Amino acid sequence: MAAKPKPLDAEIEALELDARYGHLAAEAIVELAVNRFRDEGGIATVSSFGADSAVLLHMVASVDKSLPVLFLDTGQHFGETIEYRDQLASDLGLSNLVVVHPKSEMLSARDPGNDLHKSDSDLCCEIRKVEPMARAVEPYSAWFTGRKRHQAESRAQMPVFEAVGPRIRINPLARWTTADQAAYMRANDLRENPLVAYGYLSIGCFPCTQPVKPGEDQRSGRWAGLAKTECGIHLPGLEALTNAA
């Protein structure tokens, strides 16, 4: 039986990968990461099927349409997002969509009225996103995200390869701009989440998402009026859970 990867091993590997490959084009990063990790613990991609999701999914599909695509169904997504998820997966021929749900017992105990977001948005995200995310990535050695540095100040220094506990998180689009995103969407005739047309430039659960006002950053419509800027699936809370996995 192979030894379980240790967080320090992942930290060293992520630094080495970022130094060696972090400068490459996004498509090249996706291809080399799939080839590296597919048979070494496995690799998946996490997607919200939100405003910017189509680009990374198209790149993944170009390499391996059977790669697991992990979608966190919080139970509070816009109906448009669920419909878009199914349409885009069909467009791209993605054959391994994995839908992950919150634990029903946690919802019953902590959010029986489906209104926890009003009183404790952090706990709501922990139950509906962070804990399910930790379960979703547990079988894999690495996973892709579509995060970009320009999206928010909290992401400005984000590396392409980074360690999360004993696993590697890969952000192939880290250096991309909104112009890069738009050009790729046009060049490949990719379907867009219909909510984008209504000003939703970052799309999460419907109670905590609103259209972005002119001049604001893309994620300003998330948890508007709160200091909160991330749901937690990209923060240290996830690392603590994945370390325990």
Swiss-Prot record:
Q: Which cofactor does it need?
A: [4Fe-4S] cluster
The entry's free-text remark on the cofactor is:
Binds 1 [4Fe-4S] cluster per subunit.
Q: Which UniProt keywords apply?
A: Cytoplasm, Iron, Iron-sulfur, Metal-binding, Oxidoreductase
Gene3D superfamilies hit by this protein: HUPs
Q: Identify which residues the record assigns to the active site.
A: 231 (nucleophile)
Instruction: State any single GO MF term.
Output: 4 iron, 4 sulfur cluster binding
Binding positions for [4Fe-4S] cluster per the UniProt entry: 124-125, 205, 208
Q: Which reaction does it catalyse?
A: [thioredoxin]-disulfide + sulfite + AMP + 2 H(+) = adenosine 5'-phosphosulfate + [thioredoxin]-dithiol
Q: What is its main location?
A: cytoplasm
Question: What Enzyme Commission number(s) appear in the record?
Answer: 1.8.4.10
Q: Which SUPFAM superfamilies match?
A: Adenine nucleotide alpha hydrolases-like
Q: Which GO terms describe its biological process?
A: hydrogen sulfide biosynthetic process; sulfate assimilation, phosphoadenylyl sulfate reduction by phosphoadenylyl-sulfate reductase (thioredoxin)
Subcellular localization, as worded in the UniProt entry: Cytoplasm
Pathway assigned in UniProt = Sulfur metabolism; hydrogen sulfide biosynthesis; sulfite from sulfate
Q: Listed GO cellular component terms?
A: cytoplasm
Task: Give the highest taxon in the source lineage.
Answer: Bacteria
What is the purpose of this protein? Catalyzes the formation of sulfite from adenosine 5'-phosphosulfate (APS) using thioredoxin as an electron donor.
Family from the record: Belongs to the PAPS reductase family. CysH subfamily.
**Name assigned to this protein:** Adenosine 5'-phosphosulfate reductase
